[in-house]
Amino acid sequence: MTQQANQTVATISAEALRQSARNIAAAAPKEGDAWRVDDVAALFALPFNDLLFRAQQVHREHFDANTVQLSTLLSIKTGGCEEDCGYCPQSAHHDAGVKAEKLMDLEAVLDAAKAAKANGATRFCMGAAWREPKERHLEPVIDMVREVKAMGLETCVTLGMLKAEQAQRLKDAGLDYYNHNLDTSPEFYGKIITTRTYQDRLDTIGHVREAGINVCCGGIVGMGEAREARAGLIAQLANMDPYPESVPINNLVQVEGTPLAGTEALDPFEFVRTIAVARITMPRAMVRLSAGREAMDEALQALCFMAGANSIFYGEKLLTTGNPQADRDRALLARLDIRAEGYAG
């Protein structure tokens, strides 16, 4: 009798918690109001089906739910970075087998952009492993932006921290997006990186916004953080004024030789929840299913699309880590009857 009573109490308590989560989520702030971390955590706590249903509703209000954008990311300068980001094999602080390379020349970048466009990408991102770009590096990157944009591709670069005048020069060159991720919540951040402050990141995003460039800003999950840190990251992003136009959500790719190698993997459904919460809190953003996709099976990727992801990075590599082959992506999208934006291929 006592055991049955305990089971009943446990059942009632669990149901009460679920109902509480529903009530809090229903009372979440209207768009434009601030998201408290508790509000975001309440979304994470919803039953999985309820969360995905709500995310899909929000997604359909702002996007065609059966269309995704294909993006390609090219490392234009690999390795030798001064930062000590615990997840990154390009850091000079870690022995991950990535050799420092010079900045690619313009023609090689343009060849890669042409190939990306031919394969259906409408967005071309260029990443350089710098703490911040030096003057001698910025002008070649500006040339890359101009030439890639002239091909009709949406352009994005990620070069590290930017000064206000550097952001303005990139804007003048026609840059569409600048990527600078927050990585995680302010509270967990110090466990991942020590060479750049959270405020440094926010300052760069501010310079990008002031220059009139679209902001691409997201984070990485699966770095050993608690759900509260994931909620804190989403709250930080959603409370930007305005929130980012582009929100990449990365699942940690563990690389031998980096401090985060061996971290316990994130529950796959928790990753889907993160996508869904990003969609609900930032309804008009492009939510990009980014690093870590190579380790995801097709069913998990399909759930991410259901949760509101509407962009994938397309091509064999994301900077230095693996990514699904393009033909696998095309086959998956075809099976799901999902169209690639602007591509009839």
Swiss-Prot record:
It catalyses: (4R,5S)-dethiobiotin + (sulfur carrier)-SH + 2 reduced [2Fe-2S]-[ferredoxin] + 2 S-adenosyl-L-methionine = (sulfur carrier)-H + biotin + 2 5'-deoxyadenosine + 2 L-methionine + 2 oxidized [2Fe-2S]-[ferredoxin]. SMART domains: BATS (SM00876), Elp3 (SM00729). [4Fe-4S] cluster binds at C81, C85, C88. Pathway: Cofactor biosynthesis; biotin biosynthesis; biotin from 7,8-diaminononanoate: step 2/2. Keywords: 2Fe-2S, 4Fe-4S, Biotin biosynthesis, Iron, Iron-sulfur, Metal-binding, S-adenosyl-L-methionine, Transferase. GO terms for molecular function: 2 iron, 2 sulfur cluster binding; 4 iron, 4 sulfur cluster binding; biotin synthase activity; iron ion binding. Residues 66-293 form the Radical SAM core domain. It comes from the Bacteria. InterPro entries: Aldolase_TIM, BATS_dom, Biotin_synth/BioAB, Biotin_synthase, Elp3/MiaA/NifB-like_rSAM, rSAM. SUPFAM superfamilies: Radical SAM enzymes. Its EC number is 2.8.1.6. Its cofactor is [4Fe-4S] cluster; [2Fe-2S] cluster. [2Fe-2S] cluster binds at C125, C156, C216, R288. Binds 1 [4Fe-4S] cluster. The cluster is coordinated with 3 cysteines and an exchangeable S-adenosyl-L-methionine. GO terms for biological process: biotin biosynthetic process. Belongs to the radical SAM superfamily. Biotin synthase family. Homodimer. Catalyzes the conversion of dethiobiotin (DTB) to biotin by the insertion of a sulfur atom into dethiobiotin via a radical-based mechanism. This is Biotin synthase. It comes from Cupriavidus metallidurans (strain ATCC 43123 / DSM 2839 / NBRC 102507 / CH34).
